[in-house]
Design a protein with these regions (language model features):
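Catalytic phosphate/metal-binding cores of nucleic-acid and nucleotide-processing enzymes, i.e., regions
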Residues: 1-152
């Protein structure tokens, strides 16, 4: 099925985001290592059992960029769409990964994910992704109960 024929969803936003990443690997060679973690999705009972045996876990973020930048050791992005919110397991995972030194955020669009990824890639030294310029430019906010950056 062509992307243009698909109804807009988390899946289409993730496809658009990963297409952008693949098309910018010449500009940002480290994007070669960005990847989707297939922990979600609906599977039949047999396939779900096999994936669980293989190590699939609930709550793991959608996208991993295991490349250190600024003060971070890597980046996790959870993509959502519409009114979807992170599950309790996703919030725990994001908090744990932040404590381990990763930058973690929830993005509600491919465009938002691209913007925060570009900001992350361009970090230098011990820089963080929570300065005023980031707030102004990327509509950065931390959800009061989740404690995780949310990018629109």
């Amino acid at each position: 099925m062509k992307l243009a024929d698909m109804k807009r969803s988390e899946d289409t936003e993730q496809i658009l985001f990963m297409q952008w990443c693949r098309s910018h690997e010449d500009e940002y060679p480290q994007l070669h290592w960005i990847h989707h973690i297939p922990n979600g999705g609906n599977r039949n009972r047999k396939e779900a059992a096999k994936f669980k045996q293989m190590g699939v876990k609930a709550g793991i973020a959608d996208i991993c960029f295991p490349y250190p930048k600024g003060r971070y050791v890597g980046m996790y992005i959870e993509l959502k769409y519409g009114d979807n919110i992170p599950t309790p397991q996703q919030r725990v995972f994001m908090r744990e990964m932040e404590l381990a030194g990763h930058y973690c955020c929830i993005c509600y669009s491919a465009a938002g994910a691209v913007r925060v990824l570009q900001e992350y890639i361009n970090l230098s030294g011990g820089a963080e992704l929570n300065g005023a310029s980031f707030e102004e430019e990327f509509e950065y906010r931390v959800h009061k109960t989740w404690g995780i950056p949310v990018i629109n």
